[in-house]
Amino acid sequence: ERLVVLPLYPQYAAATTATVCDEVYRVLMGMRWQPSLQIIPHYESEPLYISALSNSLNLKIKELNWKPDLVVASYHGIPQKYFDKGDPYHCYCHKTTRLLTENFKDTEIKTTFQSRFGPEAWLKPYTDKTLEELPKQGKKNILVICPGFSSDCVETLEEISIQGKES
């Protein structure tokens, strides 16, 4: 009788969250019986989400046998033109990082964007370029987190775990 849709993208973007909603509506259009529908559009700043991120990051830092010079919060990128047209994703990513930073006053956290492809401009700064530049700035102990997904994303795991180390 009730359908709650929670897209696994904490930060709303038309290309992701709205696409999930479009598919839900498409399926519902073919149904005679309609459930009560609630869609959680974004939760980038929800206290429970920020707390879960903070706890996860804190545990990871404690597991390390080194102190990070910097934590890179790498979000999946979107084309710059989406932001220029008013997509709030970029703002939501920075909001998540800002709220996370409030729980780690002694740790610098930087927002970056990954997974760009094609010739057009994407949101910056780019994760791969940032990871290449940080050692030149004396930051060699870098921890990368990916708060743009609520569960592991194979593309992101490959990109950050393998390609990120190569940078």
Question: Can you name each region flagged by the protein language model?
Answer:
Residues 1-167:
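Extended amphipathic ligand-handling, pore-lining, and cofactor/metal-binding catalytic surfaces
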